[in-house]
Amino acid sequence: MKRTILIALAAATTMITCQPAAPVAPLAVYDGPKRPEWAASDNIYEVNVRQYTEEGTLKAFQSHLPRLAEMGVDILWFMPIQPIGLENRKGELGSYYSISDYTAVNPNFGTLEDFQSIVHQAHELGMKVILDWVANHTSFDHVWVAEHPEFYTKDVDGNFPIVAVDNDGNPTDWTDVADLNYDAPGMREAMIADMDWWVKNTDIDGFRCDVAGFVPTDFWNTAITTLRATNGPLFVLAEWEDPALIEAGFNAVYGWEFHHIMNEIARGHKNVSAIAEYAAKGDTLWPSETMKMYFNTNHDENSWNGTVEERMGDLGNAMYVLAAMMQRSFPLIYSGQEAGLNHRFPFFTKDTVGLDWSTPHGQADFFSQMLALKHKHQALFNGELGYDMSLDTDTATNSIMIVRGEEGEEDQAAAIFEFGEVSSPFDVPENMDLVIDVTGAQVWVSKLD
């Protein structure tokens, strides 16, 4: 979720909490693999249930599972499907991230059995399912407010719950959600128990953790260790960009910084040197096993900052190719991109424009080709399993060539990106096949048997 700090409120509110509790030790020891074997070359697809179909239900979405599997989707990430709070609700339907009960399903979306059926069919089709988890805050009418008021942050006068705050204690503009107090005895264990409930009752394969950097890192270490000890190597994605979260057990983090670089290049505000600078910094900053979720859109970007076309013009596909070619890349597709999504989904109401699923769109072919390349070519695998990346930039033409894999290796992938008005000076790779040709980008790969 996006956070906009209300500076004016910061001076008016002083935060106090219970006496700090000692960090909860992992409830079990886990010495198994951190990353599931199936995550080696996986991609991720974000599911916005409310806006995906005219019905806006889990059952209606389920009919799309065979198509998504055929397209090559590996991981389905469901935005929160729990009930949405009524108190201080924004808009008619409210924010998905204002949850009133962690262990229930939003009746507007369907039932627990509906979701269980989706997970079962997704597994049969070879896909995995992860659920969005909102650990930083709840709705103001969450069941914990009455049952465990001590779980919430209080103001100087002892009032609770209060609006969610940032890491400096400043109130956000998320006026529909209440801040949780991670120093409260018993609160961490309750959160982990509710996460485990979903794994045990629905057989999901992991979590995408909302605004993970606003939650104590030692909690994540405890939670991930405990959940893996009882459920095996779950896949966990952080909506944040901090190496400490990889050390705490996350498999992947957001590539927010690179996303903003792509936006700026598309707008002509930066050139390709920004890509090289970003890549060089990452070589020293991130653990080798890091997976970065790169994207040209997601639910936040689409609703609040504009469509791919609004932000990137005709370079949207080129930017997706760029995201997929980067070292550590773990590329995202957002709901409807393969159907040519070109309008902003409203965040707190039902979309009235809709997605046209009646006929295949050319974007579906593009994404199918890109996902197939990642599956077939180890040069493009995730984390340290993928091959090393080399860059060659030409600022005069605002072009860059990216190669994954060393010369002489059996498997290589190469891409040339041209973001200027004239052609790049780079030579077309020899003994490789041209497999992707879109505005601003071309991709070649080794001829494999």
State where each predicted segment sits.
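Conserved, mostly hydrophobic/aromatic
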Residues: V47, L68, F78, Y102, ...
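Hydrophobic faces of well-ordered beta-strands that scaffold small-molecule active sites
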Residues: N43-Y45, L76-F78, V129-L131, F207, ...
